[in-house]
């Protein structure tokens, strides 16, 4: 909605950092919105102008009230509307006429309820846009500016110390989850800069607030709860911008299941997009996508506290031999790499440990920490100094408070003395044990993220490590041939589709489109038997099902016989269908069959698909979704992640296949999709890949083109 410029920034500041506030619907009734907002502002010591509006009460809590919005002075920065939904539109109109710069609307009953509510919300949008007013909501819990102590919400908000330069901002469409996530973050002493509940986003959405806060100098992590993306492509652009600014985006996006997407649409009044496409593209844009509120808090905690990202595997220290085995299973499950000790690290640990503790990763220190206070200071450098370790997790038993008070101070002393730059995490093995020891707060102050369980710690660490190792792997060349700029709209035939692939440099079998059997014989003799015949029509996408494909033709007589049979089969399946012709192609050599596809998601844009291909593609479902702008090297890595990746690399004596040629095809399909948004779908199935150095060929292909607008 709002462009990123100085004027826009000033507008948003009137909402996020108001110097004057009008509380419309101020109240003395305990628990009411108007009373709760007023209590928050007084408890926070808000020092700006505060105007109370209540036509029925001349005084509230010793402060005089105005009888109406019309009595406000002109140019108030922000109006907080604690009024019923039926009064909201008139209140916003009155605020606009008084030059109020921004407003927060708590009331529900707008677009999330149906046509009438949507019409009322559209009226709100029109008034705000006409008068240049910034508006948060409706159907939201408001905004808390922790940096300046301005809680514009009815949720009880205790003041907190300023976050400094490494805080987290909560941006959530859901007001309830904004409040819950905030409580959970404060429980783990995560410093907060802002908590913003956007609700129905009639005027300002998550993207607007995100754009305003990128580069703010105080927010290191954006913890996002987004039920529906209204501007997906803009969101991805902002994600790239935030990453360049050294800020991190952690996203919780409900909607993996169909039922969840429908529920979210009902809740927010927006249309659900494709979840898998979203995950693929936002991850590529540099967003850490999590699956639960716990993960949202846990990943945020690591990013806020760590001096640097974990760019390698992890070392685990524990006090239990049994947990050592459990840790190996857990790390395998969450895909957290546990490198073996190097000879140097093993030697250093042998020197630091008593003889009965063998060096390993995970390292079982037994109960030695109780009798050897210097143990952690001696052992931690062995892994912190190794490049193969990007992080350390201390898994400590807290069951017995007496022994815990003996163990924790030496750990604090070790971290304080070593001042590690790499992330060090603390995880209690016993989630039911007390978790309020003062030493844990000391560890947090030293940059150690503390967790109530190893699973939460390691799952979050795996997310952050995967993100850190991702890097920028975007292909920067989207340009394709100008000859492709005028494509026919609709579903293209295989022959037409292959002509486009040829212009993109993708290999296809030798062949030609013919209109009669004699011409077919001439072409077959030119390219050499064996050949294949394929019926061609945009109205016949599944030609094999209609008998429109004849394979393995080795002679002129077989071709003539096949020609007749093909036409009879197609007419039986689709009476009256006129073919564009028959494609005569040289029979492709056998190889591994893959599928390479792409589709233009209406919300997110192009996304690619790779996987096992051929007639069993849908049954096997060995596929991966990719962004359309990966580099060749990144595509090869993705191909190796497929179940058929072992066949590409060479399996049980079979030769390695030309994975580089497949990556080239995927790269070119991605460039085509990015350059030509009118292409809605591409499918190459099968793409046959041959031995290394022998390339890959598209044996069948279909392209769909949108109607020109």
How would you name each of these model-derived features?
Residues 1-709:
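Catalytic-core regions of core metabolic enzymes
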